[in-house]
């Protein structure tokens, strides 16, 4: 048989209102409630009242009903809640079959918070005394509020022994009377002090008062969780700004003065400016260029692959090494002092355009560029080669050691042809006569080396007093090795030319870009055709030029007119397009 659930949700608001009156005790006239089904089988409040006896008499014999009452058990002032489920035998069968499930639903969902649950099927189960006893037992320990009656003890009289009288009268015996014990005096009554103060229990606690939940309902406990809503960015920014930046906090110095951040910024600017000035001075030759030590050579074994850590081109490194190598020979030369050139002025006037292009990566300011342009003269025209003006004297003086110590090494000028692509620097003011030759074409043709593409300034009309001031201009050096001596550069020259080269070897070499500028090259002369074939080579690998004066070629390209300017770097001309420049010797193989 299917269960038939009851409908108590339709009138749940009315039932809940009466239930709260009973539980809270807000209405003294309502202490019990009975709900019954109507014609639509919907449970609703049927009757209410205040007498527990009337509550037990109003259950109907033909309906399944549920009742709730608030009762004060005897001997206690604590009220308890009792719920009664009435299921008589005369009720419909289907309703009685579903009584247990429906009673549990009513007790758990509708009448919550009861103390005693009773199931009644006839009038015997609704006995008032039995129900009150159940409620009293459910209340737990009971503390009587009635004063216990004092038991009055009756004064016990000692038993009196009867005297024994024999038949024969003996001599009279005296009767001993019992010794009366003195009764103790009653204790004096302690006079009770009448204290009007209600706090006589020494607990100093306020008297408990019954709380009216309608007037002062219980407040729900507030959770400690605070939900995070929309973030106030302005508040967060203000808090962050209020914090002190630890980077700006300066520790007190020994003198107790605070460090100003603006002074630190100014110091950094000054340091960067001094660094740029030192780089300019090293380029102009006012400071001594750093020398290549053995440790640096060991650390930088392959500069072609690793790059130039000192940010200098191969030509500069080679020129520095040559200048250092020939510095001993240059000290023995005697040269008259130059009154027209003061010592504090720079020795050379390098090309301003090349200066700008060289230091473009250093982001030089416009002010510094203007100072450099004002300081140096404009460069000479490239269309016409500059001719070195002769010095005011014709014969060198005797070498003086004191003057040699005062004369800077950069006063010695080089004479020769620079390689293609190298920077040409003009020095017309400080290049008084080091050679007495006029750089005419006849002298160039007479001093031509056996290699066709190389123009060497010969000293045919040069005086015998100054053979050491001429030298063939060197080419770009290798990046990781020291070039071979000058005698190995032209092994095919005639014996007369070798003697002349040895005489010219004592002259100072071509300076680096950081020292005084070299003189401009002489006018190129048309090379004479030699019957002997010039060296040529075939490219074994592809090579891309890293600088303007280098040669770019691919595999199997033919390079002609090779000049062996160094062990690792050669100068040659590409056959297919006629371009000329330096190339690494390990990228090609010689054909003759």
From Swiss-Prot:
Residues 506-516 have a biased composition (Low complexity). Residues 7-136 form the ADF-H domain. Residues 237-248, 270-279, 297-312, 332-341, 350-359, 398-414 have a biased composition (Basic and acidic residues). It is found in: Cytoplasm, Cytoskeleton, Actin patch. PROSITE patterns: ADF_H, SH3. SUPFAM superfamilies: Actin depolymerizing proteins, SH3-domain. The keyword Glycoprotein does not apply. Residues 200-575 are annotated as: 3 X 10 AA approximate repeats (acidic). Residues 427-446, 490-505 have a biased composition (Acidic residues). It comes from the Eukaryota. Keywords: Acetylation, Actin-binding, Cytoplasm, Cytoskeleton, Isopeptide bond, Phosphoprotein, Repeat, SH3 domain, Ubl conjugation. Gene3D superfamilies: Severin (3.40.20.10), SH3 Domains (2.30.30.40). The keyword Phosphoprotein applies. Residues 144-155, 280-296 have a biased composition (Polar residues). One of its GO terms (cellular component) is site of polarized growth. Changing residue 94 to A: In ABP1-3; reduces actin binding and abolishes ARP2/3 complex activation. Residues 532-592 form the SH3 domain. The modification N-acetylalanine is found at residue 2. The modification Phosphothreonine is found at residues 165, 181. There is a cross-link at residue 464 (Glycyl lysine isopeptide (Lys-Gly) (interchain with G-Cter in ubiquitin)). Changing residue 24 to A: In ABP1-1; moderately reduces actin binding and partially reduces ARP2/3 complex activation. Regulates ARP2/3 complex-mediated actin assembly. Recruits ARP2/3 complex to sides of preexisting actin filaments, which may promote nucleation or stabilization of filament branches. Binds to actin filaments, but not actin monomers. Actin binding is required for ARP2/3 complex activation. May also have a role in linking the actin cytoskeleton to endocytosis. recruits components of the endocytotic machinery to cortical actin patches, known sites of endocytosis. Belongs to the ABP1 family. Present with 606 molecules/cell in log phase SD medium. Binds F-actin, but not G-actin. Interacts with the ARP2/3 complex. Interacts with APP1, ARK1, PRK1, SCP1, SRV2 and YIR003W via its SH3 domain. Interacts with the SH3 domain of RVS167 and with SLA1. This is Actin-binding protein. It comes from Saccharomyces cerevisiae (strain ATCC 204508 / S288c). The lineage of its organism: Eukaryota, Fungi, Dikarya, Ascomycota, Saccharomycotina.
